[in-house]
Design a protein with these regions (language model features):
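Edge beta-strand at a domain terminus
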Residues: 142-172
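Internal, hydrophobic beta-strand segments that form the core of beta-sheet-rich folds
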Residues: 124-150
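Tryptophan-anchored aromatic micro-motifs
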Residues: 31-56, 85, 141-145
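Predominantly extracellular/secreted and cell-surface proteins with exposed
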Residues: 56-128
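Flexible, membrane-facing loop/turn or short amphipathic-helix motifs
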Residues: 46-56, 114-121, 148-158
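A short, structured loop/turn motif at beta-sheet edges
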Residues: 30-36, 69-76, 98-104, 131-141, ...
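C-terminal region of N-terminal signal peptides and the immediate post-cleavage residues
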Residues: 3, 7-10, 19-38
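One face of beta-strands
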Residues: 37-41, 62-68, 109, 139-145, ...
Length: 172
């Protein structure tokens, strides 16, 4: 094969790959980078797994409605929870934001984990959490809330499924 043919074949292959990537669903992910309006968030604590003893402690699923507003004005798309509920302890951050990474909404935070001990005591263990939610059909986002509890009685990991479902407006 001549040198010109090889160059043409490589160029054609690169162009085809570029078109395939450009037309792939991931290329349309930018369209999914808006997370606005009211959503029902479900943290499936009753389905949690992990290496921490906290993963084996029984809990119920936690559900709450939140309203989100997205902005891409800084070149990075961010969605913010409007008027978030009060933090359950003083160690939790008040502002809640997720950043769009091209395929998922991601939130990372340093926090403390409320580790229940015998006798009704609670130990506040240092932890790092990351939540990653992927847009799916009908505007539903699904993902995992992953926490690494760095030290203390609950040291280890906890993973729980999380979902965000759009709240439909009432039908009149």
């Amino acid at each position: 094969m001549s040198g010109h043919r090889k160059i043409a074949l490589v160029a054609l292959g690169a162009a085809s790959l570029g078109c395939a990537v450009w037309l792939s669903p991931a290329a349309f992910a930018g369209q999914a980078s808006s997370w606005d309006g009211p959503y029902l968030l479900t943290f499936a604590a009753n389905q949690k797994t992990g290496t921490s003893m906290a993963a084996r402690q029984p809990e119920t699923a936690q559900r709450a409605s939140y309203s989100f507003t997205s902005s891409c004005s800084t070149g990075v798309c961010v969605t913010t929870v409007n008027d978030p509920p009060a933090a359950k302890n003083q160690y939790m951050q008040r502002s809640v934001q997720y950043a769009w990474n091209g395929s998922q909404w991601v939130q990372q935070m340093n926090r403390t984990w409320d580790c229940p001990l015998l006798g009704g005591l609670v130990e506040h263990d240092p932890a790092r959490s990351i939540t990653a939610l992927t847009p799916g059909p009908n505007g539903v986002l699904t993902g995992v809330f992953h926490t690494e509890i760095v030290s203390g009685a609950c040291k280890g990991t906890v993973d729980m499924p999380v979902s965000a479902t759009p709240v439909s407006p009432p039908i009149i």
